[in-house]
């Protein structure tokens, strides 16, 4: 099966939980778009179906379209299993939920309907706001407790990276997923110095991971030969030759289909103004009156390419952060304890998120359901040169490791492809540990 060709809808059902009414729509799907993002705590999808009105009976026994006869208004379950050239996209045991039908086109003999879908956990989270507060504890422990106890997510569907800092978390009548999302910027990983987490859902489950943790884990995965093969993509003008003569592996399944689109590139002036290198941090302790002013270097030591370099000296800064610290504000009675000082994470987290988005590139590749948001892929771009291209095949400045920010699998009756938005903090083909 060609990875860019049509995929097989082995299962595609819509079920109305209130009535138990269910119907298969395998032959009626015009398009199906599946989405993951490191900025989204939920999987989303968009389904377009075409119906001629002879699919299912209404309550009165009259044949009609799926939307009208089943009264599709929201909360319906859509389960599916899509067979592709390199694996299955299987949501038969974890159906997505219809949130609404934003567009419907009626013609004399057919109806075209668009359905927006989200993961079931998001619907549960939004219908059960948190009213309780969680006591001081490591943030990662509280996140695990919220997801496991409040949303009943099993441990095997959770990938939570340990945090070194503690905090009290207030529900504030937010949905559980939204409450966890608010903790990302405050979280400092146990094994790295840079704060900044992402909380997101993939087809494997939920992840609460630091930026540096995702980078290190993603690059380490390339030690596995099969993983490296499935996560390396090439952009060349010509077709790729199958040099290893493996009939099960066509290198053109890993060829970027369209020219990579650079959506953002490094802007050093903006980096200086945003405090990407050095910042001044001012703190005033309301209890003791102590005033501190320091210039801090925010360079990260974990990168997708070469090590981050700064073009300014240590005493130069272009951005100032000021914090008024109130010890004991979260404790009853009198206390001088400072809990999770924002001066320790706000400037650094802003830097880390900004640095990761220094380069934003969009590519389209043949469908690969082995890819996940948050994974690291290797992108090898053809070198543009009038010199010796045999010795310098790849563009060593722009080729290298990239992190998947947004992922979309698109399925139509004729084609299947995956669109990726990639992020990168530094350049060069090879990573440096210096």
Where is each model-derived feature located?
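An acidic/polar, Gly/Ser/Thr-rich interaction patch typically located in mid-to-C-terminal regions
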Residues: 35-69, 227-434
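Glycine-rich, acidic and aromatic/proline-enriched surface loops and short helix-turn segments
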Residues: 111-112, 118-122, 136-157
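Second-shell loop/turn segments in exported
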Residues: 127-136, 165-171, 360
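Sec-exported extracytoplasmic/periplasmic mature domains
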Residues: 147-152, 184-189, 379
């Amino acid at each position: 099966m060609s990875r860019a060709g049509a995929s097989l809808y082995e299962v595609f059902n819509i079920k109305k939980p209130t009535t138990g009414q269910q119907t298969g729509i395998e032959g009626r799907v015009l398009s199906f778009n599946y989405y993951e993002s490191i900025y989204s705590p939920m999987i989303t999808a968009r389904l377009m179906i075409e119906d001629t009105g002879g699919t299912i009976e209404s309550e009165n026994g009259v044949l009609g379209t799926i939307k009208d006869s089943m009264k599709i208004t929201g909360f319906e379950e859509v389960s599916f299993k899509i067979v592709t050239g390199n694996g299955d996209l299987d949501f038969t045991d974890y159906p997505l939920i219809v949130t609404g039908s934003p567009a419907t086109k009626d013609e004399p003999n057919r109806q075209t309907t668009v359905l927006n879908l989200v993961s079931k956990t998001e619907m549960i989270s939004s219908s059960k706001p948190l009213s309780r507060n969680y006591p001081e504890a490591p943030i990662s422990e509280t996140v695990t407790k919220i997801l496991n106890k409040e949303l009943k997510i099993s441990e095997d569907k959770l990938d939570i990276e340990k945090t070194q800092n503690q905090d009290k978390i207030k529900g504030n009548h937010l949905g559980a997923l939204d409450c966890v999302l608010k903790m990302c910027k405050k979280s400092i990983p146990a094994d790295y110095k840079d704060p900044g987490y992402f909380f997101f859902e993939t087809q494997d489950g939920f992840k609460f991971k630091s930026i540096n943790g995702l980078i290190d884990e993603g690059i380490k995965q390339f030690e596995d030969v099969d993983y490296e093969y499935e996560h390396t993509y090439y952009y060349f003008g010509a077709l790729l030759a199958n040099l290893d003569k493996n009939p099960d592996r066509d290198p053109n399944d890993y060829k970027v289909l369209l020219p990579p689109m650079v959506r953002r590139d490094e802007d050093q002036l903006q980096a200086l103004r945003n405090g990407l290198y050095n910042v001044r941090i001012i703190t005033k302790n309301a209890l003791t009156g102590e005033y501190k002013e320091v210039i801090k270097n925010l360079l990260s030591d974990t990168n997708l390419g070469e090590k981050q370099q700064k073009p300014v000296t240590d005493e130069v800064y272009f951005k100032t952060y000021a914090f008024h610290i109130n010890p004991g504000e979260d404790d009853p009675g009198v206390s001088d304890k400072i809990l999770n000082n924002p001066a320790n994470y706000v400037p650094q987290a802003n830097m880390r998120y900004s640095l990761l988005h220094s380069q934003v590139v969009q590519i389209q590749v043949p469908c690969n359901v082995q890819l996940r948001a948050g994974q690291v892929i290797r992108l090898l771009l053809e070198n543009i040169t009038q010199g010796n291209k045999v010795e310098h095949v790849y563009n060593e400045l722009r080729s290298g490791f990239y992190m998947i920010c947004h992922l979309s699998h698109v399925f139509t009756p004729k084609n299947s492809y995956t669109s990726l938005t990639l992020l990168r903090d530094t350049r060069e083909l090879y990573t440096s540990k210096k």
